Amino acid sequence: MIIAPKVRGFICTTTHPAGCEANVRQQIAYVKSKGPLANGPKRVLVIGASTGYGLASRITAAFGSDAATIGVFLEKAGTEKKPGSAGWYNSAAFDKAAKEAGLYSKSVNGDAFSDECRAKVVELIKADLGQVDMVVYSLASPVRKLPATGELIRSALKPIGEVYTATAVDTNKDELIEAHVEPANEEEIANTIKVMGGEDWELWLQALDQAGVLAEGVKTVAYSYIGTDITWPIYWHGTLGRAKEDLDRASSAIRQQLSSKNGTANVAVLKSVVTQASAAIPVMPLYIAMSFKLMKEQGIHEGCIEQIQRMFYTRLFDGEFVTDDAQRIRMDDWELRESVQQACRDLWPQVTTENLSQLTDYQGYKAEFLKLFGFGWEGVDYTADVNPEVNFDVVAM
């Protein structure tokens, strides 16, 4: 079939297999261009491995450090009538490239919140790798089925305490709007912590530890975002921030758990990037369009792969292991430079629908968004007939 982009709300409902492969190949080429990672991991589990920072972590481990990788995700395969999800095609492309390079690659497609999924991964590690020396936790899901009760819990993207009102961009109409978001109640706050907090990360590390599949000196990282005063009302001071604070609690608990094997557990605070997750947060698209323009002008712009490659190569494995007071690895350091943030604050009141594309990198934001789904990649013939059915080495749960 010939596949064109169809955008509804903040998701693109179609995906392009060849474009997704181009995305993965480009990320691999970037990591290879940086040379090998001297003291990198060799057996890596990535939970949430199919898009964004999780995918970038899997690519960096494999192609920077020749690591064997197991990726866990929940994605949809394509059928002859309908394309699959971008994460499915990304993972298929990764698997193909890894095997071409002679690297071990296995994927598990299932609910990463479930005990069954954990058991399957433990079984795979025992059979194929023995142990893992790194566990990356990069899940972004709006819902979680609690393994103990089967109860389905939904998160809420809301402020706490008062209505949040701010200028935002309607990405469908390309115009500025006033966004009003009602504050969360106590139940919504608790639910968001349950879905997006650190409990599941803890459950994973407990299961892996109890099964004896964590190597001496194992490192685990979970990804977070803090942002700045511009986005704090909807993010860090809202329900999402409470969940991310719970990641800090979990990281401390996991650190204690791993101390007997000299393991480490840290939250890595990353910069804002265009992802399916960030597109859903009011104000983020406008803030990202602004910060992208400023960071590109200052020569410090990074996407997912640049961030993760820098973290692996300069913080986690080579270079100095520096953390903040809460033991977090701060990869948002460039974005938080005052030269970027003050310029954003100055720019915010000046932006109108008419000057949106001049004052911000809004067109760059839109292009990046479509690229997530495989559209707009150079060298891909979008008029060609493509097969939406792409199979690879994946364990279906």
From Swiss-Prot:
The record marks E75 as: Plays an important role in discriminating NADH against NADPH. Keywords: Fatty acid biosynthesis, Fatty acid metabolism, Lipid biosynthesis, Lipid metabolism, NAD, Oxidoreductase. The active site is at Y235 (proton donor). It is an enzyme of class 1 (oxidoreductase). It holds the Pfam family Eno-Rase_NADH_b. Substrate binds at Y225. NAD(+) binds at residues 48-53, 74-75, 111-112, 139-140, 244, 273-275. GO terms for biological process: fatty acid biosynthetic process. It comes from the Bacteria. It catalyses: a 2,3-saturated acyl-[ACP] + NAD(+) = a (2E)-enoyl-[ACP] + NADH + H(+). Disulfide bonds: none annotated. Its EC number is 1.3.1.9. The keyword Cell cycle does not apply. Pathway: Lipid metabolism; fatty acid biosynthesis. InterPro entries: Eno_Rdtase_FAD-bd_dom, Enoyl-CoA_Rdtase_cat_dom, FabV-like_NADH_b, Trans-2-enoyl-CoA_reductase. One of its GO terms (molecular function) is NAD binding. The keyword Oxidoreductase applies. Monomer. Involved in the final reduction of the elongation cycle of fatty acid synthesis (FAS II). Catalyzes the reduction of a carbon-carbon double bond in an enoyl moiety that is covalently linked to an acyl carrier protein (ACP). Belongs to the TER reductase family. This is Enoyl-[acyl-carrier-protein] reductase [NADH]. The gene is fabV.
